[in-house]
UniProtKB/Swiss-Prot annotation:
Regulation: Enzymatically inactive by itself, and become active following phosphorylation by PKA.
Keyword flag Nucleus: yes
Organism: Homo sapiens (Human)
Compositional bias ranges of the Low complexity kind: 960-1009, 1027-1040
Gene: PHF2
Basic and acidic residues: compositionally biased ranges: 548-563, 578-624, 665-674, 729-757, 916-925
Stated name of the protein: Lysine-specific demethylase PHF2
One Pfam family cited in the UniProt record for this chain: JmjC
Biological process terms in GO annotation: chromatin remodeling; liver development; negative regulation of rDNA heterochromatin formation; protein demethylation; regulation of transcription by RNA polymerase II; transcription initiation-coupled chromatin remodeling
Annotated consequence of substituting residue 954 to A: Abolishes phosphorylation by PKA and activation of demethylase activity
Post-translational modification: Phosphorylated by PKA on specific serine residues, leading to the formation of an active lysine demethylase complex.
Top-level taxon: Eukaryota
Cross-link position per record: Glycyl lysine isopeptide (Lys-Gly) (interchain with G-Cter in SUMO2): 711
JmjC domain boundaries: 197-353
Tissue spec: Widely expressed, including in liver (at protein level).
Amino acid sequence: MATVPVYCVCRLPYDVTRFMIECDACKDWFHGSCVGVEEEEAPDIDIYHCPNCEKTHGKSTLKKKRTWHKHGPGQAPDVKPVQNGSQLFIKELRSRTFPSAEDVVARVPGSQLTLGYMEEHGFTEPILVPKKDGLGLAVPAPTFYVSDVENYVGPERSVDVTDVTKQKDCKMKLKEFVDYYYSTNRKRVLNVTNLEFSDTRMSSFVEPPDIVKKLSWVENYWPDDALLAKPKVTKYCLICVKDSYTDFHIDSGGASAWYHVLKGEKTFYLIRPASANISLYERWRSASNHSEMFFADQVDKCYKCIVKQGQTLFIPSGWIYATLTPVDCLAFAGHFLHSLSVEMQMRAYEVERRLKLGSLTQFPNFETACWYMGKHLLEAFKGSHKSGKQLPPHLVQGAKILNGAFRSWTKKQALAEHEDELPEHFKPSQLIKDLAKEIRLSENASKAVRPEVNTVASSDEVCDGDREKEEPPSPIEATPPQSLLEKVSKKKTPKTVKMPKPSKIPKPPKPPKPPRPPKTLKLKDGGKKKGKKSRESASPTIPNLDLLEAHTKEALTKMEPPKKGKATKSVLSVPNKDVVHMQNDVERLEIREQTKSKSEAKWKYKNSKPDSLLKMEEEQKLEKSPLAGNKDNKFSFSFSNKKLLGSKALRPPTSPGVFGALQNFKEDKPKPVRDEYEYVSDDGELKIDEFPIRRKKNAPKRDLSFLLDKKAVLPTPVTKPKLDSAAYKSDDSSDEGSLHIDTDTKPGRNARVKKESGSSAAGILDLLQASEEVGALEYNPSSQPPASPSTQEAIQGMLSMANLQASDSCLQTTWGAGQAKGSSLAAHGARKNGGGSGKSAGKRLLKRAAKNSVDLDDYEEEQDHLDACFKDSDYVYPSLESDEDNPIFKSRSKKRKGSDDAPYSPTARVGPSVPRQDRPVREGTRVASIETGLAAAAAKLSQQEEQKSKKKKSAKRKLTPNTTSPSTSTSISAGTTSTSTTPASTTPASTTPASTSTASSQASQEGSSPEPPPESHSSSLADHEYTAAGTFTGAQAGRTSQPMAPGVFLTQRRPSASSPNNNTAAKGKRTKKGMATAKQRLGKILKIHRNGKLLL
């Protein structure tokens, strides 16, 4: 039977509950209590030798400490920071001098520290009670020792102990700590600060002060039968040895604290809970090296308060303090929540939650205590309303803060985090609603009482003082309407001359002190309504009105530009008896108004563009309007009137053409005086402009930036007699200069007529020219040779009908000359058939002419051909701009990048493959030459089709456009033909996609419109001699059985439009839905381009 191994000098088996250490010599294990080694000391031992091995191997050696500035008494390196709590830190802290706490600590006898005293004076500063007499505090006799604490609390009680030198917490039994306390050789500095003994036998020896019992929420409002037990924070025992130090902290939950020193002495380092100090504390506490920074060095003042034996110190909510124990000390303490500083308690609680601090003196169930207090306040409000009394102001303010906290805790996203502390059987939503109602009733009642008090006083000074206090700080509310000022100033003008001194109040050299925070809080709560009440009650008194007008006039004159100096002369008088009393108040308001005007002007200039210096006077004129001076317009913005100015200066009525719409787009963009959002500083608040500048329209404008880039590299344009060379000067060019559009080019005689009648022919031509211009951007003479001569000849005739200028360049024998000739045709074509396009397309034509170096001889040579193409000037084209806000951008998106079927993207690199020289006709385009030429060709080819149809079956005679479905046109456009057609690949004239798509679009228009306009027919017959015969005769010779591809489209789809019989029959029929107007028909026809290229 194996024996159980034994260890240590006591030769006992291994015990898991006892600390043991191994000897490095004999490798045996020893209990720490048997060999005198504490568990906390073991990490510092490098080599341990048991008592038996010490005789042969020597004593144990400790680790070499390299951070004496942190944990040891040795010399500290100058480079490394001092650790808080180390011996070097304590030494420096003792030698440092601090401001005396006499300035902030109130010394009050215990008998005077009552509830009435606290409500009257508040509890915002520490209170030191020299003796416990009259305080109601019960503590043991001074002969009470630490050993007595062990006896009454229990030696096995586990306590949290702070290692001061390392600023770390550990747990020990009370017996072990008491043994350490009475030991003569203290190797460490240990501190017990959170021994709560309210549930032990020692609780009967200690009772908190009476004032704490009366103020504490937990003592008064927490039900005894609640499911959650009361927080045990009222009775703490502090056992601190010499040089114990607790770093700066805020008590958990923002609770107030009381300390009574039974034995020894304690030193408190107190810091006010100002907003800046709390922010600094939060930043310091969240730093990883906060234990190496003394927080008192970061604030303006830290007060030193020494509490000696028998004294009691009360520390209010939110105060940041640290404690030092110069000698061994035994003290008692407690924490409590109260209604005198609810706001500070809530703020400290939020800071604690953000920092996620694990304080040793945690206030458990803080939110539960707040809920119980809220329920009590609701009952108190109801009782006060029934009795006709008013609750104290601090309770009303505390109820508002609590109700706001309740709302935040019960929000949907935060409820899961806070519902654990919600008391049982509570209806939070109902409590919040009822409490808000009672608060509102209480505030209304208090405001109703206030005018009565003012009436009893019946003094001008009192009225003026109330008016000054309750006047809101907003410059808008402080300024009456301009019309009221003018009326009063007219009446007061005679008094102005007599009173030179009181009217012009001198500017004080130093600004007066701002009002205290409690006053501003009251002003925030009901400032607006209080102001109204005070104005109504004080309106009959003339001195008040004079004073207000005098101040308002001076404030306005300082806000106005220097040229408005008339306001300085009309100064209102103030009676002599009121000048002495009110001069300081007026100066205060004057400083406030002056600061606001300067800050507003500073923000305006900071956020404005360079032209803002020219616009500031106009804006200040508008600010003087009655709208800006309206008292009810509390939240009006600085540039709210700028919107009115913009609406007056909006675009004039312009042509509905495409570039007319683009010009409107340019003019719509207001000339900005500031950035997209203007922030106006108003006492530290930022207000956002109600009408921001819309930047959305800038994105499409950048799409046209390639036109500007093109202009930068173009050669100097050639001066021509028929084109205005000064067209580059635009009256309404934008500041950025990304797109310049000529608006001064002289149009033709018929241009204004068509412009006024809403014609869109100009816009369509401009679209074609823009498309041609983009399509020809990257062509050069060496890119690729042209197509065969027969193909060029056929396509040239077709494009001369359509006036598609860019593709002429691919038909010339010499590549570069063809480009110049095509641009010449483009320039003259726009001049001849301007119809409203002269103003908008002039600059693009000049750019095109400048790039291709137009020859004047070629220009005259092609003039006759173009004259024959444009004989339909009496035709009125309906506008297409209603499809999109910016049709030029929509139509550009329909273009193709190359000969592929992919749609054109404006952001992609423009460079179509050769020999294609032009883009297909874009959506919204209608060119008269295409209609007339193709209609005439269709008329001739339809007769040939009629002769062929006699030899065919009866089913083919019934072929009409009414029976032709969209699938027919789709299949034809995809390259399939009917029985009378041939594949498009066999026809040489169909090798250019631009010409085929142009012809197909117009042919589809004729075929799908059963009742075309009569102008179209007359024009097509008149132009048939040139367009049809001159172009197609050679191509159609000997091929009567196989007509050309354009004829295929027109023959299959247009017999009703070309045949007189079908035309007469069609007039009797009702037009199709969506095909009544030319605009509808054209829009329907142009959709065939979306499926890809057309093969004829």
